[in-house]
Regions:
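Sec/Tat signal peptide C-region and signal peptidase I cleavage site
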Residues: 15-19
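Non-catalytic cap/lid and distal C-terminal segments of serine-dependent acyl enzymes
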Residues: 34-403
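Short, basic/low-complexity N-terminal boundary segments at the transition from targeting/disordered tails
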Residues: 5, 20-22, 135-140
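Sec-dependent N-terminal signal peptides
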Residues: 4-13
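N-terminal edge beta-strand
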Residues: 20-38
């Protein structure tokens, strides 16, 4: 089941892309351009190209059949727009529809070769894939939370902590709210976990988490809090190029993935944060959430340490993808779940997309909760296993915690 989960998660990530920028000379090409009518124009200079296309999650999705281990299933992939060549070998495509306010990832395909946009310096990495980024903000829309505004900003630090379980120091990304450095106040702590193939940078780059926190706090919609972004790959020190492995290509197939070691070691992180930062070191002032594999980790950490977190958020959680026999932490789950709820957590929050390949396992888990009368909050969105949904879930979850 875990191999199937990894394969399906891989399909949700765009292909690796690269491009070179001409630093001197050549015509100026502007791309992307958000037009006054809400459409978006993409341009790519390739005078010798035969065919240029653009694809990304701003396009309507296409459904396609895939087969894995003899099982056929339908997955959603972004649609494709074909550019037309113009003057000077500049290819252009304008969406025939208004692009809704949101944050999107896209790439070009030049004669079948994937490329990032050389005229757009905003690039994200998801595992080993590079994509160009398009942000369409609008006042009053959710995407406005993803933009940088003239509000008090928190501080983002890269912090190393000693892990006795791993046997080496490991890196965290830590957000402290505006005013932390000049205050003597203590703060609640939210721990945010990434998905398979991700790392401690994923939520800050792809997820726009620090912008979301800055804006929600500035609006008075969230309490000032410390936020800790962990690295769930217990065999790794840190994100790619930030560890002793050097120039190693990122991969989803890492040792000790979803086999209990990370969850077992999680109290090390909490202890370190409580010792280094001015935290309110008690259950009611701690929250945890995560996407996909991070949702799997969130659930198992929550039920194995029921006195640690009052708030838990599961975003497209990879429920039931590991064999209970691989770790004692995954055994006696129903008993642990009952104990977790007996201790009256403040909130269990679940979010999933209607076409997410993990939708059914999340539905089955909710049925278990319902059958036992265990309370939770639930959000169902359009779309599948995508960052668009996970950003939505974070903006919904954060205002509910530490009330």
């Amino acid at each position: 089941m875990k191999k199937l989960f990894i394969a399906l998660a891989t399909l949700c990530i765009g292909p690796t892309a690269s491009a070179q920028q001409a630093l001197f000379g050549g015509p100026s090409v502007e791309s992307p351009v958000i037009n006054a009518d809400g459409t978006v124009t993409f341009r790519f200079q390739a005078p010798k190209a035969i065919k240029v296309e653009v694809t990304g999650d701003f396009m309507p999705v296409q459904k396609r059949e895939v087969e894995f281990n003899g099982n056929k299933m339908t997955v959603e992939t972004p649609g494709v727009g074909e550019l037309k060549e113009g003057k000077g070998g500049v290819w252009e495509y304008t969406t025939p529809f208004v692009v809704a306010p949101d944050m999107y990832n896209y790439t070009f395909r030049v004669d079948g070769v994937s490329q990032i946009d050389p005229h757009n310096m905003w690039v994200n990495r998801d595992v080993a894939s590079l994509t160009s980024v398009l942000l369409v903000p609008a006042p009053g829309e959710r995407s406005d939370l993803y933009a940088i505004h003239k509000v008090p900003h928190g501080t983002v630090s890269k912090v190393w902590y000693p892990s006795a379980t791993a046997g080496f120091d490991r890196r965290l990304t830590v957000y402290t709210p505006a005013g932390y450095e000049t205050s003597k106040a203590k703060y609640p702590v939210l721990y945010v976990l990434h998905g398979i193939g991700g790392d401690e940078d994923a939520w800050v780059t792809q997820g726009r988490a620090t912008q979301i926190l800055d804006n929600l706090i500035a609006r008075g919609e969230a309490k000032p809090m410390i936020v800790v972004f962990t690295n769930g790959n217990i065999a790794c020190e840190a994100a790619p190029l930030e560890n002793a492995d050097g120039y190693v290509n990122p991969t989803m197939s890492l040792p000790k993935t979803m086999e209990g070691t990370f969850e077992k070691a999680f109290p090390e992180i909490v202890k370190f944060i409580d010792s280094r930062y001015r935290t309110i070191a008690k259950k009611q002032s701690r929250a945890i959430c995560g996407l996909s594999m991070g949702g799997f980790h969130t659930l198992n950490i929550s039920v194995n340490y029921p006195d640690m977190f009052a708030y838990s958020g599961m975003f497209s959680a990879a429920i039931g993808v590991s064999d209970p026999s691989v770790s004692p932490l995954y055994q006696d789950f129903d008993k642990k779940l009952a104990t977790y709820f007996a201790k009256k957590p403040a909130l269990l929050w679940i979010g999933i997309g209607k076409t997410d390949f993990l939708f059914q396992s999340n539905t089955d888990f909710r049925a278990k909760l319902d059958a036992n009368g265990f309370p939770y909050k639930y959000m169902e969105t359009d779309g599948g296993h995508i960052w668009k949904n996970w950003r939505i879930y974070l903006t919904e979850f954060v205002p509910l915690i530490f009330k």
